[in-house]
């Protein structure tokens, strides 16, 4: 079991920016569940919410036993550009994987070194930097990563 992350090479991200974007991609499958407040218990003090407990998450047995309790294996690949990165989306969808559940598109808010490629519904400029997959069985991960080279 391994997690595949594919980052865009054409953006020429600094090492720090690249690391941050890959970290966002790695954590996305967990943080997507943590952000669902309907599933959280709340801690109240004087009638006000002072904390959330987002850890009532449901994590697939194989992911928990082989990845979270294991060695957190990751493969970081490079995409030449946005179009090649989007090919990973097509491959994933062809394998029956779903965006927002099995893979996550990471878009930078362009507050530091990147220029916006698009503007979101809130008027915030964003640039697609990478795609992160939840931990996948090695054979599925390989079907995605074999089309990309390791990030150099």
Spell out what each predicted region is.
Residues 1-152:
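Positively charged, small/polar-rich N-terminal and surface patches that mediate targeting and assembly
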């Amino acid at each position: 079991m391994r997690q595949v992350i594919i980052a865009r090479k054409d953006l020429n991200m600094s090492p720090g920016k690249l690391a941050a974007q890959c970290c966002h991609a790695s954590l996305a499958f967990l943080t997507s569940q943590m952000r669902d407040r309907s599933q959280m218990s709340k801690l109240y003090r004087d009638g006000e919410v002072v904390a959330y407990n987002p850890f009532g998450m449901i994590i697939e047995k194989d992911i928990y036993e082989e990845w979270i309790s294991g060695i957190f294996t990751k493969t970081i690949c490079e995409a030449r550009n946005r179009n090649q990165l989007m090919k990973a989306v097509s491959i994933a969808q062809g394998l029956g994987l779903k965006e927002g559940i099995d893979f996550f598109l990471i878009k930078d808010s362009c507050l530091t070194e990147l220029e916006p490629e698009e503007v979101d519904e809130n008027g915030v400029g964003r640039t697609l930097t990478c795609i992160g997959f939840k931990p996948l069985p090695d054979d599925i991960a390989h079907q995605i990563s074999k089309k990309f080279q390791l990030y150099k």
